[in-house]
């Protein structure tokens, strides 16, 4: 039945995504080919205070990364730019410097750093139009949206963002620090709270998220052969988050 098919969509997305990932690996060679780094500890944190994390001896760190603070639609020539398909995309230098500092202090001490890539609502309507999902609900409980990979401009910006940050932080020279993985969104099966695209059924949500994941994976893989791209599910596992209805949240493991 339709409901039964929908329940399996979040499991299927993983299989389909990695099937397409394998095809993309054979079709396009990465600019930088390295092995995935290894560490001798499982200890990890979602880090806010870098020095505290280092004092605790963590070897895995997750940092929130807000694309709304990154993009510069005004094309300020003092900001770094990325050229994609003949178009120029500019990125906020002060925000990059801030993230550089956190990443480099961690990775220089042997910590494996993962970025949680997020789309927060900003006070800039132009930025919101570029990065936020067109169907994100105004009444959402948090300021987080699914990514805009729906419109042409949104998709172009998303790919440019992912290529730019993979080049910057998964580069062999590590001059800005090193990122080993990119987590696309946060707890997306409870999307109403953490990756909002309005009220939606599981089938339509996963189709949208799969498109975003494929764009992210392709962008990262064009730069790095080894950096990983992750989906993010909540900790409720095989039950739906009870605070939401079936158009707001789905079980992560049917």
Predicted features along the sequence, with ranges:
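Secondary-structure transition/hinge residues
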Residues: 6, 170-173, 224
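Noncatalytic carbohydrate-binding groove/subsite architecture in carbohydrate-active enzymes
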Residues: 161, 166, 204-254
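Positively charged n-region of N-terminal signal peptides that target proteins for export
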Residues: 4-10
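Sec/Tat signal peptide C-region and signal peptidase I cleavage site
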Residues: 23-26
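N-terminal substrate-binding region of glycoside hydrolase catalytic domains
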Residues: 28-170, 174-177, 181-183, 189-201, ...
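Bacterial N-terminal signal peptides
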Residues: 11-21
């Amino acid at each position: 039945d339709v409901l039964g098919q929908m329940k399996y969509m979040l499991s299927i997305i993983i299989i389909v995504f990695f099937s397409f990932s394998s095809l993309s690996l054979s079709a396009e060679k990465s600019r930088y080919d390295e092995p995935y780094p290894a560490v001798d500890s499982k200890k990890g944190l979602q880090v806010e205070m870098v020095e505290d994390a280092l004092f605790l001896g963590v070897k895995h760190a997750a940092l929130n990364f807000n694309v709304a603070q990154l993009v510069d639609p005004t094309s300020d020539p003092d900001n770094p730019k990325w050229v994609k398909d003949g178009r120029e995309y500019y990125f906020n230098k002060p925000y990059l410097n801030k993230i550089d500092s956190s990443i480099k202090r961690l990775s220089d001490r042997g910590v494996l750093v993962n970025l949680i890539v997020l789309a927060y609502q900003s006070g800039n309507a132009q930025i919101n139009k570029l990065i936020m999902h067109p169907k994100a609900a105004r009444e959402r409980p948090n300021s987080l949206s699914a990514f805009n990979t729906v419109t042409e401009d949104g998709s172009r910006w998303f790919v440019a963002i992912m290529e730019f940050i993979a080049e910057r932080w998964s580069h062999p020279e590590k001059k800005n620090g090193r990122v080993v993985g990119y987590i696309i969104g946060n707890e997306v099966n409870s999307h109403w709270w953490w990756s909002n695209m309005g009220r939606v059924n599981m089938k339509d949500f996963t189709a949208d998220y799969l498109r975003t994941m494929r764009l992210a994976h392709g962008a990262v893989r064009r730069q790095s052969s080894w950096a990983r791209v992750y989906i993010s599910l909540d900790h409720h596992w095989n039950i739906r988050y009870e605070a939401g209805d079936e158009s707001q949240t789905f079980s992560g493991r049917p």
